[in-house]
Amino acid sequence: MTSSSPRNEALFDRARQLMPGGVNSPVRAFGSVGGTPRFMVSAKGAYLTDADGAEYVDLVCSWGPALLGHAHPAVLEAVHAAVDRGLSFGASTPDEANLAAIVKERVPAAERVRMVSTGTEATMTAIRLARGFTGRDLVIKFAGCYHGHLDGLLAAAGSGVATLALPGSAGVTAATAAETLVLPYNDLAAVEAAFAAHGSNIAAVITEAAPANMGVVTPGEGFNAGLSRITREHGALLIVDEVLTGFRTGYSGYWGLTGGAADAAEPWSPDLLTFGKVIGGGMPTAALGGRADIMDYLAPLGPVYQAGTLSGNPVAMAAGVATLAHATPEVYSFIDARSLELSAALSSALDAAGVDHSIQRAGNLFSVAFGTSARGVHNYDDAQGQEVFRYAPFFHSMLDSGVYLPPSVFEAWFLSAAHDDAAMNRIFDALPAAARAAASAAVPAGL
């Protein structure tokens, strides 16, 4: 287990007296890996520094936004200049349109863009807009896909092909959950069956462009294109959640690597998309984009209401514009190469330690799934069936060696343009011991 960190421990003790679980987002509590969460006090490039002064190579990258590395000079310069002009105006600002124009240039399917503050807000608005535009009530989501913490999309999967879901969180009413159909991911037959049973009342299908919250799961060949075809045939909308993958997996997000690619074997296009994380460069910003005729259903032009005091905040807009301006094709090529290097080294270390595993990949995002080499991970059941118990000792070995991983096996690993040779070598050096720790993990009773 990780060595003593007294300042972090004291901060966590205090935080637990003031905040539920001592955190403002559950994964930060280290609940699935155990031990004391790290309280970070600074970040620069590829490194984080915690309250005890320990330095870590960062493979979380703020869950994606730190694409260029932490505290990138150009982003800081833009933010400082924006702060000097004022923090919030309650009015429109030039950079709102500047950022929207960048999104539209990179993702032409986003013909209109609405800025919001969080990914949850973006998906919430997308669902409301889809219902308002179609006049229908039901939404299909996939088990294991995460779209923020809005009530209707926290529904858990039921049994059967198109079972109306039960609430997946206390506080979500059965009536709300009943408007969500939860289906197995990568199963077009289940989608077809759901539309056969409920098609006249299905407003939308929402899916992550490539799921990364049950570990990374690659969409099967033709899956996203199939969703586009089925929704179009039935007059429903396809909402593609790129909050995590957008501008992280590539210049035009995961859609740009697949359905929107010039050489796409089966081109497809969403009706609505949601963006977050990278789009704000580390500031709280997200966006909804899509077909002009649908987006124009939003107020003030249309009957679907959405508003936000801090939507399009000038400091956040400045951070987003600066980040995307420096997120060039060369940056993505560099991160892609680093991702391949790291995943290969990870797999090699686990092989050497005799740990069965598979590496799950979507663009430059990847994760490890223990005990899955024979079948891989294609859906939520596969993800849940892995040898989760091996991750905690692996995580803490890496942490002790100065490498900060996602504190859950069900999260993606992130790299940045700041992960230079020194940072990579530190990670490589830590992998063999961590792999041995995973190999020697105690198997829980009953497995």
Curated annotation (Swiss-Prot):
SUPFAM superfamilies: PLP-dependent transferases (SSF53383). It is found in: Cytoplasm. Its main location: cytoplasm. It comes from the Bacteria. Keywords: Cytoplasm, Isomerase, Porphyrin biosynthesis, Pyridoxal phosphate. Gene3D superfamilies: Aspartate Aminotransferase, domain 1 (3.90.1150.10), Type I PLP-dependent aspartate aminotransferase-like (Major domain) (3.40.640.10). Pfam families: Aminotran_3 (PF00202). It catalyses: (S)-4-amino-5-oxopentanoate = 5-aminolevulinate. It is an enzyme of class 5 (isomerase). Pathway: Porphyrin-containing compound metabolism; protoporphyrin-IX biosynthesis; 5-aminolevulinate from L-glutamyl-tRNA(Glu): step 2/2. GO terms for molecular function: glutamate-1-semialdehyde 2,1-aminomutase activity; pyridoxal phosphate binding; transaminase activity. GO terms for biological process: protoporphyrinogen IX biosynthetic process. Its EC number is 5.4.3.8. NCBIfam families: hemL, PRK00062.1. Belongs to the class-III pyridoxal-phosphate-dependent aminotransferase family. HemL subfamily. PANTHER family: GLUTAMATE-1-SEMIALDEHYDE 2,1-AMINOMUTASE, GLUTAMATE-1-SEMIALDEHYDE 2,1-AMINOMUTASE 1, CHLOROPLASTIC-RELATED. This is Glutamate-1-semialdehyde 2,1-aminomutase. It comes from Arthrobacter sp. (strain FB24). The gene is hemL.
